Amino acid sequence: MRAFLPLLFSGLLLSSLAEVTARAQDKPQPTAPDFQKDVLPVFEEKCISCHGAKRRGGKLDMRTLEALLQGGDTGPALKPGNAQKSLLIELIHYKEMPPKKKGPFITPQELEMLRRWINAMAGRA
């Protein structure tokens, strides 16, 4: 009987792990934020007045993905697939942008959405 208990315990443990794994795989993965729908509205509210058609602070235009990838005086604003190494995220994270006198900071939720958007662009140059 004692030899049977470890076997029974192992079987129960394996079946529990299999169920947890199956549930995790069934969970829908959050979709990557969309530039037009999710990202651009934030930029329009908080960035484009200084980085758009009329003004291009640092020679950076934030109205299109292509312009962000091209960047401005300091190089590309984004490193696709790596938000942590993207200048845009660094400047927002340390609250260097937007400037205090120019308007509201990007919220923590917006910053996280921007990180997810950049990280989802892996493989894009």
What are these regions (language model features)?
Residues M1-F4:
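Positively charged n-region of N-terminal signal peptides that target proteins for export
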Residues P6-S16:
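Bacterial N-terminal signal peptides
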Residues E19-A125:
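Aromatic- and Gly/Pro-enriched helix-to-coil junctions and flexible linker segments
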